[in-house]
Amino acid sequence: MPKPFAIHPGEILLTEFMEPLDLTIYRLAKEIGVPLPRINDVVKGRRSISADTALRLGIFFGLPAQFWLNLQNDYDLRLASTNTLSKIKPYKAA
């Protein structure tokens, strides 16, 4: 069974939010008060969106922080889905 298709939330941040608004990584990091490497790593898919980052992005873009955390959780769950999980059988009480 192939891995489910997973899009890193950083890619969504870049293509759906930053690019349409002509926001640079530098500008976004400055506006939300985080170090530039944090946003750079998120956009490059090398870092997860933390609760702190989700809160800041939520305020800046006018969305609930939960939106960003849901993107991250969905991505993490899709990556965690593997063939070995299919071997686990639900427990049945005797």
What feature does the model see in each segment?
Residues R56-D76:
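A contiguous, mid-protein "functional segment" used to position or interact
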Residues L23-D41:
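Short alpha-helical DNA-recognition segment
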Residues M1-L23:
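A short, Lys/Arg-rich alpha-helix, primarily the initiator
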Residues R46-I59:
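Short, basic-rich loop-to-helix N-cap that marks the start of a DNA-contacting helix
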Residues L69-A94:
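Short, charged recognition helix plus adjacent turn
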Residues M18, A29, G58:
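The alpha-helix within a helix-turn-helix
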